[in-house]
């Protein structure tokens, strides 16, 4: 996912400036990573029936992030982890509104294909997945974070390990466990 033309060091330097109170640094980071954020948004909206578009999702995420009282980001991976979390919240809110309009519906069948979901009823699935992730977080916050960062954030195993401060092998085990748990929970 990383754009080779955007240096990790530049993003980290700008995030440091943001921590020091330079609010313009956030806009510069956003400009530098906009293309990658669009790719992240597209992955959040991979369901064929999605009516929320990529640009709207990226812009709504920007508004939520720029208004955050205090953003304490360490590096590019941490930034994408937060952006993924915010985008997931926006997609879930959108699904709730959409689901409220439809009320009801059939049961949802969910299958994992390595890292992607096969979706039959988008709004219902997003809500079911969000509820299951809430239950997973109660069981194990780390399993939940690994799934969220890998699936919603599009982070690699290495980036996920860096963000969470754990070993690569731990991320690999947790990624396997979280997908298996969610598969059982949502079957």
Task: Kindly label every feature range from the protein language model.
Residues 1-4, 20-28, 39-60:
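Short, charged helix-capping/linker segments at alpha-helix termini
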Residues 48-57, 73, 80, 94-117:
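Short, basic/polar amphipathic helix motif occurring as a linker/hinge flanking DNA-binding modules
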């Amino acid at each position: 996912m990383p754009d080779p033309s955007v240096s990790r060091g530049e993003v980290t330097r700008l995030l440091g400036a943001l921590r020091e109170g330079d609010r313009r640094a956030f806009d510069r980071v956003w400009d530098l990573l906009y293309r990658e954020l669009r790719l992240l948004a597209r992955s959040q909206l991979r369901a064929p029936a999605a009516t929320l578009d990529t640009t709207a999702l990226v812009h709504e995420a920007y508004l939520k992030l720029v208004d955050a009282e205090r953003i304490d980001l360490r590096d590019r991976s941490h930034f994408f982890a937060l952006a993924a979390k915010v985008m997931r919240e926006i997609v879930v809110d959108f699904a709730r509104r959409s689901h409220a309009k439809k009320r009801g519906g059939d049961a949802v069948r969910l299958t994992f294909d390595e890292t992607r979901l096969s979706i039959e009823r988008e709004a219902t699935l997003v809500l079911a997945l969000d509820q299951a992730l809430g239950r997973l977080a109660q069981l194990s916050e780390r399993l939940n974070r690994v799934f969220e960062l890998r699936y919603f954030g599009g982070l690699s195993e290495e980036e996920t390990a860096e963000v969470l401060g754990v070993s690569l092998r731990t991320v690999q085990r947790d990624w396997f466990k979280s997908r298996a748990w969610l598969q059982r929970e949502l079957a």
